[in-house]
Amino acid sequence: MFVASEAFPLAKTGGLADVCASLPKALRALGCDVRVLMPGYAQALDRVLRPRVVAELGEVLPGAAVRIIAGSMPDSGVPVWLLDCPSLYRRAGSLYCGPDDADWADNAYRFGLLCQVAARVALGAAGLRWRPDVVHAHDWHGGLVALLTRGAGDARPKTVFTIHNAAFQGNFALDDAARIGLPADALSVDGVEFYGQLSFLKAGARYADRLTTVSPTYAGEIQTAEFGCGLEGLYAARRDQLSGIMNGIDTELWNPATDRWLPQPYSIDDMGGKAGCKAALQQELGLCADARAPLVASVCRLTSQKMSDIVLERLPEQLAQHPRMQFALHGRGDRALEQGFDALAAQYPRRVAVRIGYDETLAHRIHAGADILLHGARFEPCGLTQLYAMRYGTIPIVRRVGGLADSVVDLDTLAPHSEDATGFVFDAPTGDAMSEALRRCVNLHDARPGVWSALCRLAMARDSSWSRSARAYLDLYAALTPRRRVEASDEARGAAAALARADAASGRRRRAPEQSERLRQERLARQVALASK
């Protein structure tokens, strides 16, 4: 059972929602019986398929009468349970904030309730005819589940806690602990107390049977003071129970050949439609119609974490150095940054387009229509936007940190296989380092269009699916529950074997043309490496 605060398309503020939708889908394809438990936001209740009430739980916490509404995810059919409590979840504003962008004052209560209900379901106390062998909780919103189930003995399911972002800790007043039903013996520095506060994230990291992060590099980084946000000692102490598993993406949803939100389809074998997507995006955003202009995009939260402040500071000089360059930004975040980018768009009409907010369909069109994705980060647990970009043949520029370091291979650091090139990488979180990477990328785009096209195909060829990572999670679950999960694990492995046989048969049918294309790409990749120096 997944416990999460959001899952696409029912509710989304960021990459967490994408993972909590696409990973269950991939696990189901391997034979795993997965359910997702999340809050019943108004938008989720509107979008879920075939909703029906399956449990009336009464007051799980004082003043919070709860029922569970079952349904399924659109498109994937993954079963979902929505925690229905209108006073807590059906509100104006976003999932975590009010209309004024301030966090809801009762967020500890809102997500404490989610964890309490998850614990009841996990222990068979919710009146449902299903119990999980493993509860997989995500980020601080699900951090209390392992604590709330710890005293159940053999009836307790195993718990996995995934840290998607160690900076978001879910810290609240320690007085909130009694209201959300936490045991008094856990309210110490050896439990959930963190510098005088209650920390949901620390609870998950302290009590879960296994911990994961969303990339191998980030798993190491959070054990250091630079990235651990005060909990690095706990992460280091649990290093033997900590795994870094790279996020994947839903390659059916993110597929330029079938994407219903694109004006023209295209594929690695026929890139012609990408030019049409670029022209349509320029028209949609009010940019100059210029097929040869390097169109740089950024789709992210506007925060210092994403180096949005550096992008805003350095973009004018980049526009001056590259007179044809265009820039498109889509996202929301810090109000001062939003206003700064809006002002920049007014200063550079027809060259800079800014769309504050988040529209999933526009995000698809930007990833398809842009030439370059600029995605700096002071820290980045995994990052999904660079995976979407590569899937769509848009070249990412990223900082060598976290999951960005694990997923993007820079042209100038290739050794020995040039066919692994997927983008441009810089090291320091500075304007100079980012600007130099952008210069290298734009120069290659402008000077060597044939080589650029080959690089785009190399990026598209990268496997960003959940295939390998979903199997890693399945192995983790099976290791936690060897006696309870032997039969189910065999079923899952049988499904995986069937998929492998089908893939092998498909590969045999395509082997000759694929090898020919790969050799051609290798030759072009070597030209790319030379051209970038």
From Swiss-Prot:
Catalytic activity line of the entry: [(1->4)-alpha-D-glucosyl](n) + ADP-alpha-D-glucose = [(1->4)-alpha-D-glucosyl](n+1) + ADP + H(+)
GO annotations of cellular component type: cytosol
Keyword presence, Transferase: yes
Record-linked Gene3D superfamilies: Glycogen Phosphorylase B
Biological process annotations from GO: glycogen biosynthetic process
UniProt keyword terms in alphabetical order: Glycogen biosynthesis, Glycosyltransferase, Transferase
Region (Disordered): 497-533
Enzyme type, top EC level: transferase
Biased composition (Basic and acidic residues): 512-525
InterPro entries linked: Glyco_trans_1, GS/SS, Starch_synth_cat_dom
Record EC number: 2.4.1.21
GO molecular function: alpha-1,4-glucan glucosyltransferase (ADP-glucose donor) activity; alpha-1,4-glucan glucosyltransferase (UDP-glucose donor) activity
Pathway assigned in UniProt: Glycan biosynthesis; glycogen biosynthesis
Binding site for ADP-alpha-D-glucose: 12
Presence of keyword GTP-binding: no
Biological function: Synthesizes alpha-1,4-glucan chains using ADP-glucose.
HAMAP family: Glycogen_synth (MF_00484)
Family affiliation: Belongs to the glycosyltransferase 1 family. Bacterial/plant glycogen synthase subfamily.
Protein name: Glycogen synthase
Source lineage: Bacteria, Pseudomonadati, Pseudomonadota, Betaproteobacteria, Burkholderiales
Gene: glgA
